């Protein structure tokens, strides 16, 4: 069921009303209060967060708050998914429900923050995980509610409070997630403002946040432009999750049917707006036709080069010029909608458009992170050429790459040459984020600054206490 804007506003308003008064329960901080985490002033928001983080110093309280966030995320997974699609126009409701559920259930909590003790002839040393205090988190329009839920669990697990700076294009859904979580925390603990944001996010607010003296750590989840802006203006430590253009290589030894299913599921998920999703296929020539047929059997619709050119003319900016880039208006749109705009008839249920671009490694859809369900397929002579092309198209971003193969040497060679934070073998790239693979889930994959798949461990300071001599029991 598609929700209209007024319907969404009424639902959120009713949910917040049922959760209780904005002042919280007895014992909630009196100043500053805000509107369930939303403030007119950045200074008030930061001050409220600074007061809040001191109330989650105990692990017992952090565990309780994290459990509340998980419960709230699951309870409102569908509503927040519908809001995100309605507000941004990007992605698919069912896939966003999956993301909201995944981060609610599989983001690690305080349990991963074990202290470390070392003893020896010279005494005892203890290392513990201390909070930063107030963390600023810039969140994207592509994964708005999921990033708020994920970052909240990770950062509060470390004993922090968060000042969120949502993408203006996803302001309503991001702020609704913040308010819903705040309300639930207040209802059960009396603690307000562990999550805060400014009511009207602007470029000026973001710039002030990047250099705010009350913020100790800046976390940016977004594209190259926002990461570069943060690097330019930030006066504190920066953890950045930037862009990617993940290639997937399929060699002649691969299980082709399995590879087709993995790539289809990964590249079509939420209309390809997750940065780790498969963005281009590089198949060894000898199995390229078979791979294509298997993907078409799953529902992918093959389009011609001429049809892909028609799509590129509206879906990419400056096409076919030297500065070609994705047109934000078309990022994350349904495949059927993109096809219709180009005059191509496809079933409304179509999740993925597939275009065979042969050996054209300069094709715009291969070299640009377009974040749409339009997937190019390249044909390489052999696996060595396929890997070389993958390195070229990934552009050194260090984000994600994948390979389907039964040859361990080939997978090892590609993993070494790609040097990406995430490397997936014989599965959809989403497996690296805990969806069908081992490991935990995160919406903040820090590739430019090297932290990788973030968790509570990413958002703590390591403090060491040393007792010299005379405290050993052996």
What annotation goes with each model-predicted range?
Residues 59-64, 191-195, 271-275, 301-311, ...:
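Flexible, glycine/charged-enriched surface loops at secondary-structure junctions
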Residues 2-32, 117, 123-134, 335, ...:
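Terminal low-complexity tails and localization/encapsulation signals of metabolic enzymes
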Residues 16-23, 46-57, 69-77, 81-84, ...:
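Structural signal for hydrophobic packing residues in well-ordered secondary-structure cores
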